[in-house]
Every structure is written in structure tokens, then in C-alpha cells.
A protein has these predicted regions:
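Thiamine diphosphate
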Residues: 130-169
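A positional/architectural concept
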Residues: 126-128
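Cofactor-binding active-site loop characterized by glycine-rich and histidine/acidic residues
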Residues: 2-122, 140-146, 151, 155
Length: 169
């Protein structure tokens, strides 16, 4: 059910240089970044021909060649890593952008807010994408989040034309 979010993101990316990092629900993103679907399936089945030689499994699909830096089993663990990838690109003079996906459950992690602060302070080339289904581990987001003042753009992932207005800048 996350394919629409990816489709909009890919439309805004330059696949020859931009990077992506995500959470543990990461089966479709590597394929969108150009990873062979057979390698993704091999990883899911624990085969040596998988993206991580069958050792990463469902949560840890990875392809440096395709600038896909994997899924991560720690809730919100990919958020500071995404900023770190963007910092590296900025430091080395690259104009690549890193897309960092996270779920609404990760929005209550302290590392998210610390990372947002550093990303804004250092003007990092990173776009944080919250895939918000409205419930984080059975808790409505209105009960535990107050993020309305953060700079953001809302995008309906089902409306492909809406993604054009949210194009990465």
C-alpha cells in the first residue's frame, strides 16, 4: 500500500544521483531505485543471490550501487542516518538529495527532532517523508504529536498530480 508514495517520490528524484533510505517496510523502494526484483525476492527468501547475500532478510534490503541505503529495524533509526548521508553529499560538494522515509510511529522518537534541527541548521539536502496512516502502533497521531509548525508540504499519495506540486527543490 506504499507504492503511491514511492511513485510520487521517484517522479521528483534524479535517479542518477539522489539517494534513499527507509524503515523496515522496504520491499518496493529498492525496486523503484533500480534494484532487480529477483535480487529483492532472493533476499526475502534468504538466498545468497539477494541484495545482502540473504543475510539481511525483509528489513535490511540494501544496494549501494543503486543508492538505496536500506530499511532499518529500529523505529526511527534511519532518520539520523539519512541526514548523515545528506551531510556527506554536502561535504563532498555533491548536489544529490537524500529522501528519508519514516512512519508516524517514528515521529515520537527524540532522534527525529534532533535530526530535523541539525538538518535545518546545516541546510542539509534531505527530504523527510512521513508515511502517516494516522495510527502509530494503535495510537492516533493527534494524541502524541504536535508537528504543525515544522516546515512541510502535505501530499496526498494517491493523487499523482499533487506530487508535482511537492517536487523536491
Amino acid at each position: 500500500g506504499q507504492e503511491a508514495v514511492l511513485a510520487g517520490s521517484l517522479h521528483a528524484m534524479d535517479l542518477s544521483k539522489d539517494r534513499m533510505i527507509t524503515a523496515y517496510r522496504n520491499h518496493v523502494q529498492p525496486i523503484g531505485m533500480g534494484v532487480d526484483p529477483k535480487k529483492v525476492m532472493a533476499e526475502l527468501y534468504g538466498k545468497e543471490t539477494g541484495t545482502s547475500m540473504g543475510l539481511g532478510g525483509s528489513m535490511h534490503i540494501f544496494s549501494k550501487e543503486h543508492r538505496f541505503y536500506g530499511g532499518h529495524g529500529i523505529v526511527g533509526g534511519q532518520i539520523p542516518l539519512g541526514a548523515g548521508i545528506a551531510f556527506g553529499d554536502k561535504y563532498h560538494g555533491s548536489d544529490a538529495v537524500t529522501l528519508c522515509y519514516f512512519g508516524d510511529g517514528a515521529a515520537r522518537q527524540g532522534s527525529l527532532h534532533e535530526t530535523f534541527n541539525l538538518a535545518m541548521l546545516w541546510k542539509l539536502p534531505v527530504v523527510f517523508i512521513c508515511e502517516n496512516n494516522g495510527y502509530a502502533e494503535a495510537t492516533a497521531t493527534d494524541w502524541h504529536l504536535n508537528t504543525k509548525n515544522l516546515p512541510h508540504k502535505h501530499s496526498n499519495s494517491i493523487n499523482l498530480f499533487n506530487h508535482e506540486s511537492s517536487k523536491i527543490q
